Amino acid sequence: DGKTIARYMGIDATTSDKCLSCHAPDAPVASGGRYKRSDGVTCEHCHGPAEQWLEAHSQRDWKQTRSQYLSRGFYDNNNYTLRARNCARCHVAIDHEIVAGGHPPLQFELVAYAQIMKHWDDQDELPKDAFSVDPTIWALGQITGLREALRMLSERAAGSNYQSLDQFAHFADRGCYQCHHKLVDDALRQARGHYLMVDAVLTGVAAGRRDELTGLWNGVVAAVPSNAAAAKQKADGMAGWLGTLEGQIGRIDQDATRRMLNRITSSGDRLKVAERFAFSQSKISNVVDLDNPSTPWWWTTGGPEQAYLAIRALCRPAVGERCDAAKNDLRTMLNAIDRFAYKPDQFAASIAAAGAKLK
């Protein structure tokens, strides 16, 4: 609940830029206009300030004329790469203070996000029998998600004590990580989920580049534990590489989609790993028993969650109605990735069972 989060943070959610930077359009409000920033997310947040194109948008010839309005505030979400960037700017990185206030964790997958209040059909823009665009949108979402997660990692690595909390005056003299885990670790875990999916993307469309991806990722992972400057450098370098890759992804066909799906469903043991910071518990701990008190609620299951969402996005384009045969396995998988009671072995078994039925 936004009001509760704001109260914990000591801010007004209807006026604070901490909230409105993502929950309101990024444009100045015209004097005397009817719109109020406190109205929250509206059409213009995703499509751009509409003053100079709204009337044209209602005309029959909009599809033929919309390119004329790109310089007048209209944001072209028909370009899948631009759409991914538009969504990722608010749905990947998150301010630690907001997390501490109770904001739910983010898990970015573009195809799933696009189903919420969906009011368009991408296939309408294509020939009648064209292959689904969902695999292409999924792939671009993962590449963009990884790039944004690496930028978050870079920012946190550059901050004082690996925390990037020095931007807040009340944290400036604190060494929070002496008692708490480093925030850069959270960014790394979030990035890992996207990295595993980008590996699957390259398996489908550019298998020869997987070694490049692995080398860059291993460099980031090696630098994070002890070298903030190197972690920032490696993260920035990999983010730049991904920016180039983003522009090289064309329409993904069914064969490539099947390769991506197979890579994911055959990698259960690799994907099931849910890394977390060191945790220990006193034998006389009074921790509330959520399921098993030795398993903290903050398990980050980025890889498993991304795998489940990926199968949902890719399955029907890849194998059609055969997806229905794996319905029960996917339900079991969803149950296994409950953040309050993650079951890695159940996840691995269910993804393998699903994969066997989808080959």
Give each language-model segment a name.
Residues 1-6, 31-41, 45, 49-302:
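Primarily the internal scaffold of c-type cytochrome electron-transfer domains
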Residues 2-32:
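Mid-chain, structured segments of secreted extracytoplasmic proteins
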Residues 13-25, 87-92, 223-230, 356-359:
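A broadly tuned preference for mixed-charge, low-complexity surface segments
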Residues 22-25, 46, 90, 318, ...:
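General secretory precursor processing signal
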Residues 289-359:
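A cross-kingdom marker for long, charged
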